[in-house]
Amino acid sequence: MDKNIANAMLLRLNKQDQIEALKSIGFTTVNENTPASDIAKYMQWSGTLLDLSLATLRIEDGEQVFFTASEWNSMSANNRSKYIRIGIRLRAECHQFIIAKSACVDAGGNKTFKWGGYGTDLRGLKNYGSGNQGLYDTFDGKENTDVIIETLAGVKDTQGTVGAPAAEVARAYKACTLESDGIEDTTVWNLPALGELMLMAKYKTEINELITSMFGSQNIFTNDWYWSSTEYDASSSWYVNFSGG
């Protein structure tokens, strides 16, 4: 459905129905006490308006807390010290998810990982060949990552790769640790589905601006290609080239 049509449908609902509709597309904190002005903003985000915010963990209880750039920059150093920055939350086009603050790296500093499973058609992952309907509406990165890791655990593919390196390193990612930051990151990180990657590529410029201001330019998306967790066939998976899609 066209996002503007979906937004118009939301506007015609009464408040309770609006709340339920927003919850169904990821705005889980909305309730009957949410101000009408906030509900109006959420409805815009469910359409075509982009909303980017800083994702943090509150050290006191590990809860995720989100701040706009202006909110974070206006806080005192003492108040900032109560939170650990873990990434950027993206909300747009009826979807929301958190983008990690930095790339995955192994012990040797390597940032490039094989997908694994070459020659294996993974049961539980739909094959999306060229032109498949719904290809760009794939937002099931968590479910895909679960299947990939479980299915390929300890399996050597026909090219000698064991397991699922890209999915495994994504799932093992930690934005903070108890030893270094005073709190352990319990976020379930994933290898994004193609639709999630396409949304990141679409808003790369805006995302990079916020990443630079919060984490430094060394952490921005580069004009490189990034694996998705969406399978093409038994021997190929989709990736997105961030220089052009």
What do these predicted ranges mean?
Residues 1-185:
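Short, compositionally biased
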Residues 188-189, 197:
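Catalytic and binding regions of secreted/periplasmic enzymes and modules that target cell-wall glycans
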Residues 2-7, 14-17, 173, 194-245:
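C-terminal, surface-exposed recognition/capping segments
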Residues 130, 162, 166, 190, ...:
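Extracellular low-complexity Ser/Thr/Asn/Gly-rich intrinsically disordered segments
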Residues 48, 75, 118, 192, ...:
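Enriched - but not universal
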Residues 97-100, 190-192, 226-228:
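Structural recognition of the beta-strand scaffold that forms the well-ordered cores
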